[in-house]
Amino acid sequence: MAVISMKQLLEAGVHFGHQTRRWNPKMDRYIFTERNGIYIIDLQKTVKKVETAYNFVRDLAADGGKILFVGTKKQAQDSVRDEAIRCGMYYINQRWLGGTLTNFETIQKRITRLKNLEKMQEDGTFDVLPKKEVILLKKEMDRLEKFLGGIKDMNGVPDALFVIDPRKERIAIAEAHKLNIPIVAIVDTNCDPDEIDYVIPGNDDAIRAVKLLTGKMADAVIEATAGESEEEVDVEEETTTA
């Protein structure tokens, strides 16, 4: 059975590209036609590309690989957070902090600070500190959580990125290239597909389109890791019976 159907893609509006005046000629191979000044994406190609990306993500996750979901534009923020959490992966949905990949040690220091602040809140340290100081510490904690909450359990650079809108996330793309981290991305008609290892041609502006495609990548992870959980249960059962 296909990973995704043409009907699902049509209903979510995945086929709507950008206005014809805002396009990247390299996307020509993924464009079906032009209608009312808007490019229509060839969904037959999208179906195949989703399948290729799905298989890559599933195989990577099955090998224990970690995927970082990235989408900071408004239309992507909720889907990126929800789907990454659903499949047990990491996400950045606010602002990409420069050096998140290329200077991960510094980012880890900020994450350690966030975890220390959370511990202080949990163990009652905040209760014995002056009110003014607590207000400042909570403000700092909230800010760190906002930008780093989705990667606070990520112990090293990820094995792949899943990106919504490579133009918007160009710093993330550049950092991934520097470290040879493969990139899966929803690529609209105004983007450069040559920058992406696994191109998913589609609308990166419609919430439903973004949710559908992001959800499929999360499904790929779940398919891989659900197998692992079953294996763990089997091993436990064997040990108990033995």
Curated annotation (Swiss-Prot):
GO terms for cellular component: cytosolic small ribosomal subunit. Signal peptide: none annotated. Keywords: Ribonucleoprotein, Ribosomal protein. The keyword Acyltransferase does not apply. Pfam families: Ribosomal_S2. It comes from the Bacteria. SUPFAM superfamilies: Ribosomal protein S2. InterPro entries: Ribosomal_uS2, Ribosomal_uS2_bac/mit/plastid, Ribosomal_uS2_CS, Ribosomal_uS2_flav_dom_sf. One of its GO terms (molecular function) is structural constituent of ribosome. One of its GO terms (biological process) is translation. Belongs to the universal ribosomal protein uS2 family. This is Small ribosomal subunit protein uS2. It comes from Shouchella clausii (strain KSM-K16).
